[in-house]
């Protein structure tokens, strides 16, 4: 009897899983930014992957689930290259000292769903407490919580006392909250990269300059030395990881680019020399214009400390200038918002700012959140297009985002990895 049961179990394990097929009837399809849109089409999805994109309305096979989007424009799911899922906007920095890391998972699960509903099917989570981002990544990947595909850095690597290090509390409280993410000198900084990789990071985040929302008042200039940043970039690349650098000040931006950092986040005060370095080194720019909307909306309302407010005021006169200059210079622009500094779910408002302030066309803006972002994630054969073999990351909107980019601010349908987001 035992042998018979074991045989039945073996057959059950060996048997192929039932193939789930879904058929989407689309009124119009943007298969990729820059490609001519298709008219009425039928998209077939099996087990989370796109099998075919066929002109016209094709009858669904027996047993397939049909999804009627015949009045919609269907396009690839969007990518936000800079979010903080476990954070919500506000200035109560002291909560860092009283709330457990586990609470970040609860907040992150809420924000993962909100983000996916907004049409963002892949995000790069750049900075979270210890294992929070990694747990969220696993939760959405295994279908335990609804949300986007998550690329996570874990805690950002920073200098001692800089943006990303714990500050603003009594020394003994700072010590308890320390995430072990600071370094001094190339050797120690390389070790931090190796530790991050060991802990589960699939991207490295550093704070190359001072930051706006931290309690340190040392300005927004360069923090890491050039040799430290080169050690970080070289070590990460040797491990197959890309590096994102939070950077506001011009010299920090230039230094990060020349060190081989892959993406510059914010880039607020980028000057001609910094942009030249980015272009020469192939460093991409993630402008996060919505971050400035978030901090401007809260300025003077008692949300931020005086230290933070002084830095906020320093940045507001520059919004969009660096993006415009970088775009004109031919620097690769990648969509990213810094969601968490403003409310999650408003991510798509970044598109209009990229067009209106940055001089980009709607097609360029859409590419920055699809094909270009996919390439920077080394996932250009997985996401960013509606094509056979790609993950079924699909959204639908009413109207034409190539004519009015604000159309993307209201998404009517979202599918991530073949699963419809409720």
Predicted regions, residues:
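Divalent metal-dependent hydrolysis catalytic cores, especially in the metallo-beta-lactamase
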Residues: 108-132, 146-156, 201-214, 242, ...
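Histidine-rich, glycine-flanked metal-binding segment
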Residues: 29, 33-75
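Histidine/acidic-residue-rich catalytic or RNA/ligand-binding cores of hydrolases
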Residues: 89-93, 133, 214-216, 253-259, ...
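Active-site gating loops and adjacent loop-to-helix segments of metal-dependent hydrolytic enzymes
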Residues: 86-104, 116, 160-178, 212-226, ...
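His/Asp/Glu-enriched, well-ordered alpha-helical/loop segment
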Residues: 98, 238, 242, 304-307, ...
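Metal-associated gating/positioning segment near the N- to mid-region
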Residues: 72-144, 159-167, 227, 251, ...
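C-terminal cap of metal-dependent C-N hydrolases
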Residues: 27, 38, 369-371, 375, ...
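Alpha-helix-loop-beta-strand connector modules within alpha/beta enzyme cores
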Residues: 138-156, 220-245, 282, 286-290
């Amino acid at each position: 009897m035992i042998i018979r049961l074991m045989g039945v179990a073996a057959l059950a394990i060996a048997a192929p899983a039932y193939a789930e097929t879904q058929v989407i009837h689309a009124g119009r399809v943007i298969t990729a930014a820059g490609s001519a849109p298709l008219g009425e089409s039928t998209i077939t999805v099996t087990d989370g992957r796109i099998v075919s994109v066929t002109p016209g309305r094709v009858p669904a096979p027996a047993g397939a689930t049909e999804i009627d989007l015949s009045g919609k424009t269907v396009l690839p799911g969007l990518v936000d290259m800079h979010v903080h899922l476990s954070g919500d906007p506000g200035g109560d920095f002291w909560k860092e000292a009283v709330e457990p890391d586990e609470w970040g998972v609860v907040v992150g699960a809420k924000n993962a769903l909100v983000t996916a509903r907004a049409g963002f099917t892949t995000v790069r989570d750049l900075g979270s407490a210890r294992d929070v981002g990694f747990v969220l990544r696993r939760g959405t990947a295994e279908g335990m919580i609804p949300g986007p595909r998550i690329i996570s850095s874990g805690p950002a690597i920073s200098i001692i006392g800089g943006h990303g290090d714990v500050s603003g509390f009594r020394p003994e409280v700072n010590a308890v909250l320390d995430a072990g993410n600071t370094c001094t000198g190339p050797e120690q900084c390389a070790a931090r990269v190796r530790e991050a990789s060991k802990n589960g990071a699939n991207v490295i985040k550093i704070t190359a300059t001072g930051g706006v929302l931290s309690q340190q008042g040392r300005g927004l200039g360069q923090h890491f030395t050039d040799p430290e940043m080169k050690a970080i970039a070289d070590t990460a690349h040797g491990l197959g990881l890309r590096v994102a650098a939070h950077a506001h000040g011009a010299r920090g931006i230039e230094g990060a680019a020349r060190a081989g950092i892959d993406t510059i986040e914010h880039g607020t005060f980028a000057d001609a020399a910094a942009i030249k370095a980015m272009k020469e080194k192939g460093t991409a720019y993630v402008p996060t214009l919505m971050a400035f909307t978030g901090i401007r909306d809260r300025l003077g309302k008692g949300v931020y400390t005086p230290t933070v407010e002084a830095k906020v005021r320093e940045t507001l006169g520059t919004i969009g200038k660096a993006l415009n200059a970088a775009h004109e210079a031919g620097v690769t622009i990648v969509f990213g918002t810094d969601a968490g500094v403003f409310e999650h779910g408003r991510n798509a408002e970044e598109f209009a700012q990229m067009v209106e302030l940055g001089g980009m066309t709607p097609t360029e803006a859409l590419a920055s959140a699809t094909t270009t972002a996919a390439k920077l994630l080394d996932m250009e054969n997985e996401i960013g297009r509606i094509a056979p073999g790609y993950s079924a990351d699909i959204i639908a909107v009413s109207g034409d985002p190539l004519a009015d980019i604000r159309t993307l601010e209201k998404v009517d349908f979202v599918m991530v990895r073949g699963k419809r987001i409720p």
